[in-house]
Amino acid sequence: MKEYQTYIFDLDGTLLNTIRDLAASVNYALRSTGMAERTLEEVREFVGNGVKKLMERAVPGGLDNPQFEAAYATFRQHYLHHSLDTTAPYPGIEKLLSELRRRGKRVAIVSNKFYAATQELARHFFPDTVEVAIGEREDIRKKPAPDTVLEAMRQLGVEAEGAVYIGDSDVDIETARNCSIPCISVLWGFRDHDFLLRHGATCVVSRPEEILSEE
């Protein structure tokens, strides 16, 4: 595996296994607004384009449902208070990030999760290894637009040359392409090998240590 100078990571399904807390908040919001719950696998399929899109997919009828805004607001409020209930780093992630920092690499998170939750999770799990964490904000286009990744590079003070984006989804592959940087696709997240290949993955790893398996 080529060694880069800057490693920018997706959050959900890449650094953290967040699916059970996301599903719990989705279903709390659906129950609170009189709608049927979703299965864990359904929520897994809905994740990847930010929490508004997650709820749009979870709510029957999406944005056209008159209860959508209430369900969306309930989800956000519930998730802010329950995002740490079962969420944890995937095995090997903390060791990977520590080794990257030991080698003097720059490390950032860029997620489509809303900004407050992204910041909270980064502070809680990776206070000494992640330098910049950017989530969805109204003033900047979310992935797959390049804007949030470019903003992370600006805050780190680095150029695109020598940077790589690491994620578990088609959105991450497209984001890296739009930034003109390589993408490492991971198999421990929310999408499988065939799905990633169909969506253009060119470098796929099954364990975090493979990202630094060779100098």
Task: Name each model-derived stretch.
Residues 1-45, 56:
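Active-site neighborhood of HAD-like aspartate-dependent phosphohydrolases
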Residues 1-5, 41, 101, 115, ...:
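Asp-based, Mg2+/Mn2+-dependent phosphohydrolase catalytic module
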Residues 9-11, 75, 149:
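Conserved hydrophobic/aromatic "anchor" residues
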Residues 26, 93-123:
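Substrate-recognition element of Asp-dependent hydrolases with the DxDx(T/V) motif
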Residues 29-30, 50-64, 121, 152-153:
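Helix-loop "lid/cap" segments that line or gate small-molecule binding pockets
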Residues 46, 50, 88-92, 113, ...:
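Short beta->alpha linker loops
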Residues 56-95, 103:
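Metal-dependent phosphoesterase signature
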